[in-house]
């Protein structure tokens, strides 16, 4: 009898929770319409996978790409609307959050065609791969709009768990298994550190979880200048440092880049940084409003270490993916300048603009690496020698993307760095900008070293990998080359026509 009553109570409670969730989704679902499109795409993928055979594989790519494109369209139609806080304060919609969501969707849209041929050649399970990519994208989008500590943590873990699964997707590869283990352990540790910092904020603010309410709670409890806030700031900064691969919290990055499947690395190298930057800008600027000098100092130290260590260690690498891992550590050091400058002096605008350029440069480079790896089976920098003699298009594409990453004019990377450093200089960050300029020159050295290898014509330097390289046709239906071409064009011409991009970035509301 008691069991029967308890069972009835459980059913009633479950029904109430379901009805409340349905009511929220029905009346406030329009505020997360782009996210709902991705959820619908995920459900459709699962249904088709259960009811179809291997011949329907092209439909999986079509559904994934279409849901991402429709989600981008829905996001663009919502641009310039008034900021809205929905779902009982858990989710915020404004231009600032939406521009980060757009960047994440753009990364995913470019990464899917980049992965098609790789998945077919390596015989990886396609449905699960696309499900993890879309779910990670969904987690990143919710992270960009999350307005309270619990939603931030859940969205972050949704993104992180999919990232761990993707990094270990080639289960028979020992390096992939090693990369997954390191990524999982370091990622779990960093999440624990981040949540510990959140718990300090929760306690000091009198039990508040919404970002703006935390500020009000700190004022009411008179704890905004207490030592506890400094402890919370340190733990949250360390947690964010792991997520952003900032030195000295970067140890996992080179191994994960080297061991994971290359399309996965391409996806994680940009989406993880965009999502973490969206979180860092809000979590530091809102709850730690009264400790701005302290977190500015912490970020300056981390940015300097990242720029110096990242670029110095990149010079010594023999693996292309490890070199790009250390290069990405240096690149995120430059982006931190924009966060430190903040909303004044166009700091956030310069950060958003550079991240857009970085997406095209980085994904273009990885597209070239995926293509070269599939045709030769090597990742060693030395084995790229003489590629121009066999495949001029691939060699030129890789050279343009690398030179753009280095910041050579008139490529997009030059204009992005110029604007970023100029904003930092105007804000008085003279030492930080000087370090950025010096390390940028250093990065050009190892990028030019690779470009020189690509263009060499001396037979004694050309390895068997390039000698036996099969030449690609002038006109190709290769989806990797499609992504590569789009990224190369963007890396080349976006900087010249960056005024409209700047205007949109400056129009974001924080």
From Swiss-Prot:
NDH shuttles electrons from NAD(P)H:plastoquinone, via FMN and iron-sulfur (Fe-S) centers, to quinones in the photosynthetic chain and possibly in a chloroplast respiratory chain. The immediate electron acceptor for the enzyme in this species is believed to be plastoquinone. Couples the redox reaction to proton translocation, and thus conserves the redox energy in a proton gradient. It catalyses: a plastoquinone + NADH + (n+1) H(+)(in) = a plastoquinol + NAD(+) + n H(+)(out); a plastoquinone + NADPH + (n+1) H(+)(in) = a plastoquinol + NADP(+) + n H(+)(out). Its EC number is 7.1.1.-. It comes from the Eukaryota. NDH is composed of at least 16 different subunits, 5 of which are encoded in the nucleus. It is a multi-pass membrane protein. This is NAD(P)H-quinone oxidoreductase subunit 2 A, chloroplastic. The chain crosses the membrane at residues 31-51, 59-79, 99-119, 124-144, 149-169, 184-204, 229-249, 261-281, 295-315, 323-343, 354-374, 395-415, 418-438, 484-504. Its main location: plastid. It is an enzyme of class 7 (translocase). PANTHER family: NADH DEHYDROGENASE (PTHR22773). InterPro entries: NADH-Q_OxRdtase_suN/2, ND/Mrp_TM, Ndh2_N. One of its GO terms (molecular function) is NADH dehydrogenase (ubiquinone) activity. It comes from Oryza sativa subsp. indica. Belongs to the complex I subunit 2 family. Keywords: Chloroplast, Membrane, NAD, NADP, Plastid, Plastoquinone, Quinone, Thylakoid, Translocase, Transmembrane, Transmembrane helix, Transport. It is found in: Plastid, Chloroplast thylakoid membrane. Pfam families: Ndh2_N, Proton_antipo_M. GO terms for biological process: ATP synthesis coupled electron transport; photosynthesis, light reaction. GO terms for cellular component: chloroplast thylakoid membrane.
